[in-house]
Every structure is written in C-alpha cells, then in structure tokens.
Amino acid sequence: MDPSKQGTLNRVENSVYRTAFKLRSVQTLCQLDLMDSFLIQQVLWRGRSGESTETSISVQQLFQELRELFQRTGMGNAAQVHPRAPELTLSLLMAMFDRTGSGILKRQPVAAALVALSGDSPLTKYRAFFQLYAEKNRRGDDSQARMTRRVLRALLTDLQQIPTVVGESYTLRPVESAIHSCFRGVLSSGIKEEKFLSWAQSEPLVLLWLPTCYRLSAAETVTHPVRCSVCRTFPIIGLRYHCLKCLDFDICELCFLSGLHKNSHEKSHTVMEECVQMSATENTKLLFRSLRNNLPQKRQRVGAVGRQWLLDQLASRDSASHGPARLCLQYKCPKAPGYASSRRAVETAATGVLCQRPSPALQGNHNRHGQTIVNIKNELWRTRDSLNTLLRERRLLRKQLHRYKQKLQGTYALQEEQNCRFETKIRELTTNQDNLWTKLQQMRRDLQAMLQPLHPSSSPQTTASKIFHSLPDDGIRRGGDSSHIKRVTRDGPEWELLPNSAKVDRKHKCQASSGKALPDSEPQEIILQSTRKQNHPQKMLSKVHSSPSAHQQDTLQIPPTEVKIPAQTLSAGKEMESCSEKRNNLEDEELQALLPRLLDAFDLDSPTGLQPLMDMELYGRAQQVCRAFSVLVDQITLPTWSEEESRLKGPLV
C-alpha cells in the first residue's frame, strides 16, 4: 500500500472504518474484487475432496494456481486483469501466513483469505467459510457437517490475520467472546450451517470489518441528491450519513470519517448510513423518524450507550496517534443475493468479560432523563387506559353488528319461505287452470260430438212409435181426415220446423250482432242440407193428405171382417209403445243433463261486461241445437211413417 495513502487512512477516527478502507484499498490493488468464492474453491480444492483440509502448498505451486485463477477470472469478467495481480496477491498471502519465510502455506487459511477479499456478498462468504472449515462426519455426508468450537476458533484466528497485515491488530479476547456468543444455548459439540449463518449475519465485532468493506465497495459510485450540511458538497457521492436526531442533517463520507460536525449536531447522535440512493418516499419517512426522535423517548437507549462505551474501549487500544473514536451508527446497504441486511448498529454490544459499567458522565446523563422517563410512563398508562376504552367500545359495536346481522338473516329467511309458498301456490293455480282448460276443451268436444247427426246405432222406432201412439185411433181406423196428423206433426212445440230462408236469415243476424263468427257453429251447407232433409218428410205427408179419396175408397172396399186387427197384434203394439216411452224418457233426461253443461261452457267463454254479446251468442247456439234436433226428427220421422203406412195398408189389402 502507498505510504501516503496509508497515512491518510490512519486519520480516520473509527477503527472499523479505518480497517475497512485499508482492506478495500488492498482489494482494489490486487484486483481480488473480481473473483468469486465458487471459482476460488474450484481452483484451490480441485481433486482434493477426499483429502484433509490441512494440506500444505508451496509458494511456487500457489503462484501457479493464482495465475490460473486470475486467468479464468479475466475470461469471465469484462475488466482487464493486471499482469502483476498474481504477484501482489502472493506477496499479500505470504505476509499474512508465512511471516517466517518457510515457503510453505496451508491451503485452508489461503482459501479463507481469498474468499474474504473477493467481491461476493457477506452471506456467500459465510457459506464458503463453513464449507472450508466445517468437519464432516465419518460417512462423509455434507448435510451432516458441523462446526465445532475448535474449528470456529481456527477460522476466526485465520481471518484476524487479514486486518493485521494492514496494521489493524485484534487481540484474542474478542475471538473467545465471539465463540461464546455463537455457541450460546447449544448443547451439542457442533453447530449446523443455519446456526452459523444466523450468528455471522448478526455481525459480531470480530467480523465487523467484512460487511463494512462490502458496503464501501457497493457505495463507491452511488450519488445522493442531497447537500452535505458541513462542507456544502452537492451531490454526495459514496456513503451518506443522515442524523436521526437533527432535522435535515446529512453528512458526506469524508466529513463523517474526519470527525467534522456543526454546532447543532453532536457526535452522540445516532446517524444512519445509506449505501443506495433513497427515493422521495424514503426521505419523507426519514424526516418523520427524525421528528419522532426529537419527542420525549420512552426509555433511555442503554444499549447504544454500552456500544458507545465499547467503541471508546476499542479506541484506547489503538496507536497513540489516533484519538478516541465515538460513534453510534446505523446503516442501510443494498440487499445482495442471499444477503439480508437491515438497519442496525454497526457496533454490537460485546459479551463476556468486556461487559463493564459505563462511565460516570453517561450515568449522569441517565439521571437527568430519569424524571422524563417517569412522566412518559405515566402518559403511557393513560394511553393504555384510553386504548382499553376504545377496545371495549369496539367489542360493543361488534356485538350490535352481530345482533343486527342475525335479525337481517331471520328476515331474509322469512322472505325466502314466503316466496317459496307463493311460488308453490302459483304452480298449483297454474296446474288447476290447465286442468280446467283441458276439461273445457273436452266438454267442447263432447258437445260437438252430441250436436252431430245421430249415428245409426240409435233406433228410430222409439220416436216413431211415440208419434204413432199420439195419433187418435178412431181417425186412423175410420179413415178420417188426415189433417189432424198434419197439424200434430207441424204444429207441435218440440217438432216445429223452420223454413230455410228463416234459418239462414236468423243465422246471419246472430253473426252480425255478435261481431264474430261462433267457433262451434255449423257451416251453412250443413244447415241447408238439414233443411232439405226436413222438406222431404213434409212432402211425403202432403202426398198422403192429398189423396184422401183414394184412401177412403180403399177403406170402403175392405170387408168388416178384415178391418179388425187381431188381439195379438194390438198387444205387441202396446209393448213396443211402452218401450218407446222409456227410451224417450231416457233421451229427455240426457238432454236436460246436457243443457246445464252447455250453459256452463258458454259462461266460461263469455267475457265480463259484455252481456249483449253473450246473449246473442247463446241465442245463436240455441238455434244450432234446434236445427240439430230438427235434423234428428227428420231422420226418425220418414222411416217411421213409411213403416206405419205399410202396416195400415197391409190389413186393407
């Protein structure tokens, strides 16, 4: 190292930063920051996985391996490797581990030194240390590797040779304290890798220079857009130190390490080290944190006081040219892969025999803040009471909310039940409506079938016998005037026949008055056909009445003995007459039962409030029924009269 540069670095008050700056200079000079721990292990331990870790190596062999190491580093890195880098590195390693000049070095300390000065993150270096020094079990299982107290002591002792080569020596006492803190609470003889990494990341004092050197290398090109409050430099390049007590107070790296401060800022204030550029949000949070620190604190930072006292004790062991260093520092560095860095104090509290009582000045400062602490505690109790009150109110509101929610759920369930009932009723009513409509259609079909002309299965003898029985016997036997028969046939109330013109005119009047055609009305052709069928028996009757003289002549020519009808023939006629009367009574009953159904069907189709239209429609349908009955009478009367006429003519002949 250049003596002038070394003299400049010796003016740094804090020993940790002084050691880190010196090692950073050596690292840059030898270009060791271009290496990585994986490549170092691959070159130095190539083909020696089964050999002992205590293997020695000569200086010539070490030089060849260093040349190969830098050659492979230059191939994988864009930076140009200096030709003298292997020589400088060999000289550095010999100054560390071969002070007697024997020319023989151990591989394990050499590899640990190269890993410590490489460019990897601290966590990667800690893993490499464990792999180099951990003792494996008899089966050679790497997952069961352990680090014992003896191995950890050897590791820390070898790593202590690195700051010693730059004039920063450490005693053996911090090593024993570090071992005690690492194995605190451990009952076994060794620890696993997770426990070792957790302890190393807590930054023990003996290894504090290693993460500090990494932060210095990471912040060399970082620019902070703030102005130094001491030298007024803008922007700050490198490390930035922000006071957590003073408002908007930033110090550059040079002013902080030189011990330059303003009157408003004291050295006892806690400062935070920034290795990366902070965003506007983080700066705002930092400002609020400073405001919070200016308020009365809950308790005295005894841990910070102890760390400050520890730094004073360490500074007293330095050379006489260095003054006492007092620092309480927090830092923020970039998170390297696998390395979880947090804001914490750079100097951790020492354990074991180094834990002594602080100075009387610090105790007086503690007494001055005693009353303030008591007041803050009282205020804290009042705040807790208020918080408990708020919690009780919160529980009450939650109970009310739960009660209202239950009521709402009950109302919702009731509404759902009512909706289900209504839907069931709607379905039932719809089903009933469909059934009624089906019944109505069936009744319409039945009515249409009954209004059709009578099928041949119905016997016409019933009506004929009834008509024949209703005639006066004396008129037939005496051959009286047939006008009586004609009157009974045409003037009877149930056998009244209408002319074709009257029926057609009445049908047209009904259709014009109702405004719509009847759905079940028969066509006009069927009505005319039925009218023609009615005229046929009328013509036959007129022919019978038109020839009374011939009939009388035939009657006068019959002898008295032949006019008498036998008693057997009369008894058979009476039986036929009684059967016909029974059938007529059954037909009358069927017609009387059909009439109410017909009226009900008409009532279902008729809309409310339209009584005239309903009357006209009912009148039209009644006409259809009358016409159908007329057709039925015509079909029955004609064959009956023909049969009776043949019966009457038989005895006469």
Swiss-Prot record:
Listed GO MF terms: zinc ion binding
Amino-acid positions noted as binding Zn(2+) 1 in the UniProt annotation, renumbered to this chain: 228, 231, 252, 255
**What does the tissue specificity note say?**
Strongly expressed in the nervous and muscular tissues.
SMART domains given for it? ZnF_ZZ
Keyword Cell wall biogenesis/degradation: yes or no? no
What does the entry list as the binding residues for Zn(2+) 2?
243, 246, 265, 269
Where are zinc fingers of the kind ZZ-type found along the chain? 223-279
PROSITE patterns registered for this protein in UniProt: ZF_ZZ_1, ZF_ZZ_2
UniProt KW Zinc keyword:
yes
Can you say where in the cell this protein is located? Cell membrane
Its Gene Ontology cellular component terms are: plasma membrane
Coiled coil where?
384-411
Pfam families under this entry?
EF-hand_2, EF-hand_3, ZZ
Q: Which UniProt keywords apply?
A: Cell membrane, Coiled coil, Membrane, Metal-binding, Zinc, Zinc-finger
User: Which protein, by its recorded name, is this?
Assistant: Dystrotelin
Traced from the root, the source organism's taxonomic lineage reads: Eukaryota, Metazoa, Chordata, Craniata, Vertebrata
Report the gene name: Dytn
